[in-house]
Regions:
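Outer-membrane beta-barrel channel domains
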Residues: 1-230
Length: 230
């Protein structure tokens, strides 16, 4: 894809367009539920530690109640960020038990300072010499997996992954909005999630921790009292 103002077939934008998205996806082949090679997006659990599936905020949490919590989607969007690149697969081990594995390595745009990444850029814009100088200057690696068990109305799962950058993250924590931004080059996260779905009651949640050493949790509940009130 080409954004407005970006050079066409020149200044490092090429061979024709600035951004391409490619993938190969196989679904429903024996025990293999999903195999995606190339660029893809993931959503695990409630998305507390892993969600680049374009759903954020409180409303998305409520709208996702009762839905499949482990999703691999091919990245076919023109959006040149917020995706993984590599391979992801979900296999049914036995009835009700699925195992998902994923690995990703990709270049990222960033603002660098003193040998570190001060800001990760997600606009995907490469129009000027300044923006081109920030293109693909660092790389990100991610590998992990998910185990999910479903029986009747009950679902439980666990997710874990390791994430690293080629250069350390060095945000300016003096800025209020970056006060809690991560610092360093290697991180890990792990979580457990659950859901119970019945015709009237839906309960869903996820609790996580990581290399930051703190615990986070998100939980939601919906109850249908009548056709007009819930």
């Amino acid at each position: 894809s080409k954004d407005a103002g970006e050079p066409f077939m020149s200044q490092g934008n090429g061979p024709v367009y600035d951004f391409y998205s490619f993938y190969l996806q196989i679904r429903g082949w024996g025990r293999l539920k999903n195999l995606t090679l190339g660029r893809y997006r993931l959503h695990e659990g409630m998305g507390l530690i892993l969600n680049n599936d374009f759903s954020f905020g409180k409303l998305s949490t409520l709208s996702a109640l009762g839905r499949n919590s482990n999703v691999i989607r091919a990245h076919s969007s023109r959006y040149a960020a917020n995706y993984l690149q590599g391979a992801a697969a979900t296999v049914t081990v036995v009835r009700g038990l699925d195992v998902t594995g994923f690995v990703s390595y990709r270049k990222i745009d960033a603002t660098l300072k003193d040998g570190g990444i001060q800001t990760i850029l997600t606009s995907g814009l490469h129009r000027t010499a300044s923006e081109m100088a920030k293109k693909d200057v660092a790389s990100a690696f991610l590998a992990g997996g998910n185990v999910s068990y479903r029986r009747g109305a009950l679902h439980v799962g666990a997710t874990g992954f390791y994430n690293s950058f080629s250069l350390p993250l060095t945000p300016n924590r003096k800025l209020l909005y970056k006060r809690f931004a991560p610092v360093g080059s290697a991180f890990w996260n792990a979580s457990v999630d659950y859901s119970y779905v019945s015709p009237r009651l839906v309960v869903q949640g996820e609790t996580a921790t990581g290399s930051c050493g703190v615990v986070a949790t998100v939980n939601a509940m919906s109850y249908v009292f009548s056709n007009r009130f819930s």
